[in-house]
Regions:
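DNA-dependent DNA polymerase catalytic subunits
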Residues: 2-192
Length: 192
């Protein structure tokens, strides 16, 4: 039994549940299926905040949601690049390598970032300090502002961005925030 529910698409919904299979809740439990708040490809910090935003959507006003988003945006800009990066699995690196230009046209963005990372690790002779990304690795990728030291809009990494790349000041927090937080929320709000 739920007092509110939003269906975004088939198998993608959120509900304010008061009674689930005979178990009653004093405070409604938020049940979420198929939305970015529960997807592993969303940064962990955003998963929690998307759930909180959905709670605000279900139980509060539009003004409260606007304030919540604005407050989180300020916090988001202070987080480390590693915290705001998109997690992904990396496969088929060999398929997309181009010896002339690092990567081929049509390369998925996270693979492109991994190939750029590997290129600059080898170019700067940092392979003893940082492991190369290989097929099957769990990685994170970030959008970058240009111009920057890797001359591209993305970089991937395994655990942290090598400080030798000098990229921390080029992280595109606006794009990261839009893609990791506001776009998933907009998808929910558009269906209301």
């Amino acid at each position: 039994i739920a007092n509110k529910a939003i269906w975004v698409a088939k198998k993608r919904y959120m509900m304010n549940v008061f009674d689930e299979e005979g178990i009653r809740f004093d405070i409604p439990k938020l049940k979420i299926m198929g939305v970015e708040a529960v997807k592993s490809s969303t940064p962990e910090v955003c998963r929690g905040k998307i759930k909180d935003a959905i709670r605000v959507i279900m139980n509060d006003s539009e003004d409260a949601l606007i304030k919540f988003v604005a407050d989180f945006k300020e916090v988001f800009k202070t987080l480390s690049p590693e915290e705001v990066a998109f997690p992904r699995s990396c496969n088929y690196l060999d398929k997309y390598v181009d010896p002339n230009s690092i990567y081929k046209k049509g390369t998925p963005i996270h693979v492109k970032g991994a190939l750029i990372y590997n290129h600059y690790i080898l170019k700067n002779k940092l392979q003893r300090k940082y492991p190369l990304i290989k097929d099957g690795d769990k990685i994170k990728f970030l959008m970058l502002r240009q111009p920057n030291t890797v001359k591209d809009t993305v970089v991937s990494f395994a655990t942290k961005i090598p400080y030798e790349f000098d990229l921390h000041k080029y992280v595109d927090y606006e794009t990261q925030f839009t893609k990791t937080f506001t776009d998933p929320l907009r998808f929910v709000l558009d269906s209301i």
